[in-house]
């Protein structure tokens, strides 16, 4: 069935209509209430006249349409207070301006100390009494404007002590000859943290804690046989565990011992590498609101996380009008990383079922036992770190925030209120039923200052098709009054793409997270896919076949395994066998066919090259509604034919469309055989 659809452009007419829309429907609603109260007979006569039903329907449409683009559909923006460059007139101009161009909320980010660079004479120093007056005024004004607000979380604070900060494993090595008694050998202390900076190995007085020491036999005259396994254990000579001798740290009788780094020992004949291993602070720092510079908090310590929250964010939320703050925003990219911390060895043993300490040299790149054992220990360490960050930091911080009636937003972490950041976050949001999915957009120099809406629209469209349905901009873009049309377009797109749930046919499982070629299963093949993790795979709910349901109630038709099953763990293999018995389609070998029709799964959408799409399914009392968002990624006008696989009575829906250069279109289909098409032309250059 072919439909040559009439295109409805979202442009100047819609913008002008929106400007007086709220006043219009409120006025009409007031008239109806007035007549119903003071002139019931007239309103009864009015209602009995069938010709008036069109008026009533129009009024209802006005009310529904005016309420359609709620705050959830509107984009947000970062609001940076840099170098203390803030004043009451500036706050008023920024907030009212951002509200007027259609922003749904702001992320307040005081960054960079005023002393670093003076932007203008009337600036205020961060955390000074005048600064708090500015903060209170911004809360008050945002509250009066009914503007949503979030606060940026920087987990650094002057109150964080070195032993409460992020930790890392450090070590020194010493080469010795065995076969004789070793007396008074100094095993130098590894690097340590002192007074805001890292000290080199051998320095004393800094923060450092020993974990264990080892004597490791090696072959050759100049160095260890394993040649350091940090690149690939598979290409290294593994060290048998019988050639690894633990050295008791505070005395002890395992072939002698070591006290304060001084070794008293006798080793068997041969060449030995002595490893002294411990942990210290990573030295990673951040400033609280641009001034309170301090160490980053240990992500494995709930007590340290609570100390951070109670010392800064809880008092902030208790300020006058502090309830206008509805979100706390965490940016994990700012952290660096840690591989040790509070109770890490104990947590590892409880979770992985064996003691990490005998295998600690693995963290120094020593391939113990075998290449496969080395990789297993490394994977277990990474998994433990992942679990601890999620449970001890994010879940603790989220619980503390919820006690203050505040939600948490962060980048690319699966179990938060609003996950953020591109494809991994899109997949995690689908798996765990989170909506909306945020992405920071156009914050670089190109996007923030040199990019016009005409240049930015193709990039925005591409990420809408990827699955992002709420953008966060830099306020350099949105402070301009001319930004309203662009923001209205984004709001309309986000309004439709936040409805229902995504239609994704394929789940791709890769033990390490991302497959090497993550574009392999996207358009133009006509299918969407999600990356699923081990947690999601093991929780796969196969309540009915042949579709599979994951924890977020997301349907998948096919499970792709991106590496040979022989390399998977026994736990994963058992789960895959269980899924096969339930009829789930599992493909674990290279697949050469152009589609999955042989499994009864036709392409969701068939499009020409250089186009992409997003598909949302809305289940209503009257049936289903399929919302398709199509984008033209070429700088030329195109006449295309799009073919849709729908759940309607039709087998396929074929639509002919005329798309302008970098144009986009919504095609909305329902099981009532209705079709609505909403298109946008290429935005003109200013």
Where on the chain are the PLM-derived regions?
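Short, positively charged and aromatic/hydrophobic N-terminal segments
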Residues: 6-7, 26-29, 33, 37-40
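Mature N-terminal segment immediately following signal peptide/propeptide cleavage
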Residues: 69-97, 101-105
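Acidic/aromatic-lined carbohydrate-recognition and catalytic surfaces
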Residues: 111-256, 265-266, 277, 285-286, ...
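Extended acidic/polar, glycine-enriched regions
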Residues: 232-315, 655-684
């Amino acid at each position: 069935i072919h439909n040559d659809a009439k295109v409805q452009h979202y442009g100047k007419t819609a913008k002008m209509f929106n400007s007086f829309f709220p006043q219009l429907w409120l006025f009409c609603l007031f008239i109806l209430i007035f007549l119903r109260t003071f002139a019931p007979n007239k309103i009864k006569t009015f209602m009995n006249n069938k010709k008036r039903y069109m008026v009533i329907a129009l009024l209802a449409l006005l009310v529904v349409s005016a309420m359609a683009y709620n705050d959830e559909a509107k984009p947000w923006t970062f609001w940076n207070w840099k170098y203390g460059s803030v004043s009451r007139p500036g706050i008023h101009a920024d907030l009212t301006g951002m509200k007027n161009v259609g922003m749904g909320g702001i992320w307040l980010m005081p960054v960079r100390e005023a002393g670093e660079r003076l932007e203008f004479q009337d600036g205020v120093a961060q955390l000074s009494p005048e600064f708090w007056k500015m903060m209170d005024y911004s809360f008050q004004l945002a509250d009066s404007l009914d503007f949503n607000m979030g606060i940026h979380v920087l987990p650094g604070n002057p109150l964080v002590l070195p032993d409460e900060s992020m930790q890392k494993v450090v070590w020194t090595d010493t080469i010795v000859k065995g076969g004789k008694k070793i007396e008074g050998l100094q095993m130098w202390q590894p690097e340590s943290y002192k007074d805001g900076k890292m000290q080199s190995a051998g320095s004393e007085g800094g923060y450092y804690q020993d974990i264990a020491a080892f004597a490791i036999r090696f072959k050759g005259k100049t160095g260890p046989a394993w040649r350091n396994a940090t690149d690939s254990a598979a290409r290294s000579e593994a060290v048998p565990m019988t050639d690894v001798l633990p050295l008791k740290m505070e005395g002890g009788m395992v072939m002698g011992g070591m006290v304060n780094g001084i070794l008293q020992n006798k080793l068997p004949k041969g060449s030995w590498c002595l490893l002294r291993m411990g942990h210290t602070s990573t030295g990673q720092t951040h400033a609280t609101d641009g001034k309170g510079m301090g160490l980053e908090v240990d992500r494995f310590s709930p007590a340290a996380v609570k100390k951070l929250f109670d010392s800064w964010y809880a008092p902030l939320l208790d300020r006058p009008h502090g309830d206008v703050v509805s979100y706390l925003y965490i940016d994990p990219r700012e952290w660096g990383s840690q591989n040790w911390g509070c109770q890490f060895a104990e947590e590892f043993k409880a979770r992985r079922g064996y003691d990490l300490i005998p295998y600690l040299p693995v963290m120094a790149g020593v391939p113990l036992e075998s290449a496969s054992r080395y990789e297993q220990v490394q994977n277990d360490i990474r998994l433990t770190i992942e679990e601890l960050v999620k449970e001890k930091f994010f879940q603790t911080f989220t619980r503390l925030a919820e006690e203050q009636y505040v939600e948490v937003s962060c980048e690319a972490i699966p179990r938060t209120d609003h996950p953020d950041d591109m494809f991994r976050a899109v997949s995690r949001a689908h798996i765990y039923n989170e909506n909306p999915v945020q992405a920071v957009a156009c914050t670089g120099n190109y996007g923030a200052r040199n990019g016009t809406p005409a240049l930015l629209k193709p990039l925005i469209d591409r990420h809408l098709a990827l699955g992002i349905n709420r953008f966060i901009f830099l306020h350099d873009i949105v402070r301009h009054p001319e930004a309203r049309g662009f923001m209205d377009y984004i709001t309309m797109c986000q309004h439709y793409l936040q409805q229902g749930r995504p239609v994704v046919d394929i789940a791709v499982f890769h033990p390490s997270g991302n497959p090497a070629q993550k574009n392999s299963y996207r358009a133009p093949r006509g299918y969407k896919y999600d990356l699923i993790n081990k947690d999601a795979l093991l929780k796969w709910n196969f309540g009915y076949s042949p579709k599979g349901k994951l924890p977020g109630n997301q349907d998948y038709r096919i499970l792709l395994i991106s590496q040979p099953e022989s390399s998977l763990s026994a736990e994963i293999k058992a789960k895959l066998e269980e899924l096969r018995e339930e009829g789930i389609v599992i493909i674990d070998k290279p697949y050469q066919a152009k589609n999955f029709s042989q499994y009864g799964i036709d392409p969701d959408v068939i499009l020409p090259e250089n186009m992409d799409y997003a598909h949302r399914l809305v289940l209503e009392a009257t049936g289903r509604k399929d919302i398709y968002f199509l984008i033209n990624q070429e700088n030329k006008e195109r006449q295309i034919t799009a073919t849709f696989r729908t759940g309607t009575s039709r087998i396929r829906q074929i639509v002919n469309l005329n798309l302008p250069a970098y144009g986009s279109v919504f095609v909305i289909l329902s099981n009532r055989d209705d079709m609505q098409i909403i298109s946008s032309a290429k935005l003109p250059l200013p």
